[in-house]
Amino acid sequence: MYTSTKPDKQNKLKKLIYNEKYHDNCHDYLKTTYLEKYAEPRYKKLLYKIREKIPKVGICEDTVFDDYRNVIVCDQHAVIFGHYNDVFPILATYALNACVGLVMYVPKHKIGALAHIDGLPGYSQESAKEDGLELDFSPVYENIEIMIRYLKQLSGSDESLEITYYLIGGIYGLSEVMVHDILEAINKIQNDKLKFNFMGRNLLGPGNQSRNICIDMATGKITYFDYTINSEYYGKNRKDNVPMNIIRAPRKSEAYLDITYVPISIDDSQ
């Protein structure tokens, strides 16, 4: 009797996909074993503090298939903004390997921003100089201040802004400096009119690891962004073989994040 092996192969494939997804998005890499073995020594104290004080955010729950019609995706070195009432109320990014995703969300107004930070845009002036670059400003401060300016305008209010934020992504040996500099910048920027709450983290890992995320402006919920499903959803609706909802960053400057999507018209002169 002939017995098909296809079901077994399908089950193995499903298990492989699940294991990869767990490895990349669900596992907590801020455990003592990893911190002691892989973390840059100068940042260990900070990372232990983050692990102790900030809860790990789960990014394993799948985004509902039909919700992909509401997704706008930012590429590397870019930042996108969102509003719950926009045509694209779900912000996403993918391939957060050495890059760090900075997610900002304002629950009161249901608006937010998602930055895919790679290297220099997440560096302070001091870190840039240590990397051999001569700069007369701190890229990370400039980038975060620009993000805040747009969020303030999206809120349509002069009242104080309370922002919840998450840090997701990065790998050991390369990304600790960005985590440090981003947190340092946020702590220095906040004031009576601008309050930040560090609500969750899913940080660092091995070099072969990469995270994909979505955040829904209507709920503030973070879920797993599946690049393959997104491609299937848009089918033939592509440009240069890239799904139409993925916004490629123009990469105008090495130091600045490229603002690639804003849900409503904003006057930069304000």
Curated annotation (Swiss-Prot):
Localization: Virion
Principal cellular location given in the protein's record: virion
GO cellular component terms attached to this protein's record:
virion component
Q: Which domain of life is it from?
A: Viruses
Query: InterPro entries per the record?
Result: CheD-like_sf
Q: Which UniProt keywords apply?
A: Virion
Could you tell me what this protein is called? Uncharacterized protein R721
Record organism: Acanthamoeba polyphaga mimivirus
